[in-house]
Amino acid sequence: GIKNVAKITYWDMFRAFLTGRDPKYYLFFPMIEQGKKAANDFLKRIARTEDKDDKIKLSSFQRQLKAIGVWGSREKDDLSKIKIPVWVVNGDNDRMVPTPNSYDLAERLPNAHLTIYPDAGHGGVFQYHEVFVPEAIEFFK
């Protein structure tokens, strides 16, 4: 489950170091042809030479991974009281936030709408941005 996010993240960062790739290539996209192409396209879209964000500090990064792991080990919260529409979006091959978690979340939210993008990982919304953006605009109207 999500409590393994630190292990997966560190492994993919190591793979990225060995291959000279951005860690997002491995973290957000499945390593199938469509995923690899989507990863390359995404990384080109977000490449900036100006107004770049500061890099995350190592201590902040480690605290974030620890917090996710702790949260993933907790008992599930009762979500039945949440009545507003909630859109749960994921890829069908998400290793960081395993896809079954999305189905579980959508089942426990009484007014949930679930979208699972095929052949996509954690970066499914980046991979399917041309579909996701119009759907998001419609959902939030």
Where are these regions (language model features)?
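Catalytic active-site module of serine/aspartate enzymes centered on a nucleophile-bearing elbow/loop
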Residues: 111-141
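Conserved alpha/beta-hydrolase catalytic His-Asp/Glu region
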Residues: 23-73, 78
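Active-site acidic short loop of glycosyltransferases
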Residues: 83-84, 111
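Conserved alpha/beta-hydrolase "acid-adjacent" motif
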Residues: 95-101
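Soluble, non-transmembrane catalytic domains of enzymes that act on hydrophobic metabolites at membranes
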Residues: 62, 76, 93-95, 134-139
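Flexible "cap/lid" loop of the alpha/beta hydrolase fold
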Residues: 1-19
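Active-site phosphate/pyrophosphate- and oxyanion-stabilizing loops and adjacent acidic/basic residues
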Residues: 103-104, 130
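Short beta-strand/loop motif that positions the catalytic acidic residue
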Residues: 82, 88-90, 94
